[in-house]
Amino acid sequence: MRIFTPFRVVTFIAAVFAALSLGLGVAYAASSHHGGDGNGVEGIFNGDQHSPACVHSPRLLDRNERNVINYYYTAFNDKNPKLAVKLYGGAEYIQHNPLAANGFDAFIQFVTSFTAQFPDTKVTIKRVFADCDFVVTHSLFTGTAYGTLGQKGVDIFRLDARGKVVEHWDVLAAISPTSANGNPEV
């Protein structure tokens, strides 16, 4: 049984952010990493798997960042996921969140239902990183659904060659009421 400790999760997220912010294009983790005890991250992930012609063009990276921010804000803050998909969605939508199904129709239904149930939902993107066809956001979620302190989230989006969203992963957690270091979580 694989155990994901907070340290391992934070270390992995830090490695992803470091790779993306340095423009390396590759986040590497092998099963022999971490002492070869089988508790490391398995496999090799290369961002170029989905984009054989990865170009680190500042213009394209800016476009991708802008598209993801607009996609998220249009869907959740403007409560218009249909428009978000029309403007920023690609030909397919692969979803890795276990609460949502694949496909843009499922995304529209999920967001419409969620924002109808919690109309005060607001997403504030605090940081955004882009590398090739991936964009990572670090966000604060507020509103009734998230309690008094809110929720933090890291979302990873993959975009197609036209800068349209085609895949999504996320990690979400409640903001802690106490902190050993006094630093904000988002």
Segment roles from a protein language model:
Residues 19, 29-30, 137:
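Intrinsically disordered, low-complexity segments
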Residues 34-56, 73, 109-186:
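A beta-strand edge to alpha-helix "cap/lid" segment located at domain peripheries
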Residues 24-74, 78-87:
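Short, low-complexity N-terminal intrinsically disordered segments enriched in polar/charged residues
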Residues 81-131:
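A solvent-exposed, acidic/Ser-Thr-rich amphipathic alpha-helical stretch
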Residues 63-67, 106, 149:
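Soluble or luminal CAZymes and related metallo-dependent hydrolases
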Residues 3-13:
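Bacterial N-terminal signal peptides that target proteins for export
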Residues 13-23:
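Bacterial N-terminal signal peptides
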